[in-house]
Curated annotation (Swiss-Prot):
The gene is yebO. This is Uncharacterized protein YebO. Keywords: Cell membrane, Membrane, Transmembrane, Transmembrane helix. It is found in: Cell membrane. It comes from Escherichia coli (strain K12). GO terms for cellular component: plasma membrane. InterPro entries: YebO. The chain crosses the membrane at residues 12-32. It comes from the Bacteria. The keyword Transmembrane applies. It is a single-pass membrane protein.
Length: 95
C-alpha cells in the first residue's frame, strides 16, 4: 500500500514541477515578446525620424542654394572691402 501512495505522490510532484516550469516559460515568453514589440516600434519611429530629417536637409539645401549671392555680386563685395581697407589705412596716423 505504501508503494501505491508513494507513486501517486511522485506523479503529483512531477505534475506540479511541470506546471511551474510551464508558467515560468510563459512569463518569460511574455516579457521577451513585449520587449521585442517595443523595439520594433522604436525602430519604426527612428526610421520615420530619419526620413523626416532627410526631407528637411533637402529643403534646407534648396533654401541655401536659393539664397546664395551671385558670382558677380561677390566681385563687387570684394571691391567694396578693398576700398574700406584703404580707408582704414588712411585713418592710421603715420609717424
Amino acid at each position: 500500500m505504501n508503494e501505491v501512495v508513494n507513486s501517486g505522490v511522485m506523479n503529483i510532484a512531477s505534475l506540479v514541477v511541470s506546471v511551474v516550469v510551464l508558467l515560468i516559460g510563459l512569463i518569460l515568453w511574455f516579457f521577451i515578446n513585449r520587449a521585442s514589440s517595443r523595439t520594433n516600434e522604436q525602430i519604426e519611429l527612428l526610421e520615420a525620424l530619419l526620413d523626416q530629417q532627410k526631407r528637411q536637409n533637402a529643403l534646407l539645401r534648396r533654401l541655401c542654394e536659393a539664397n546664395e549671392p551671385e558670382k558677380a555680386d561677390k566681385k563687387t563685395v570684394e571691391s567694396q572691402k578693398s576700398v574700406e581697407d584703404e580707408d582704414i589705412i588712411r585713418l592710421v596716423a603715420e609717424r
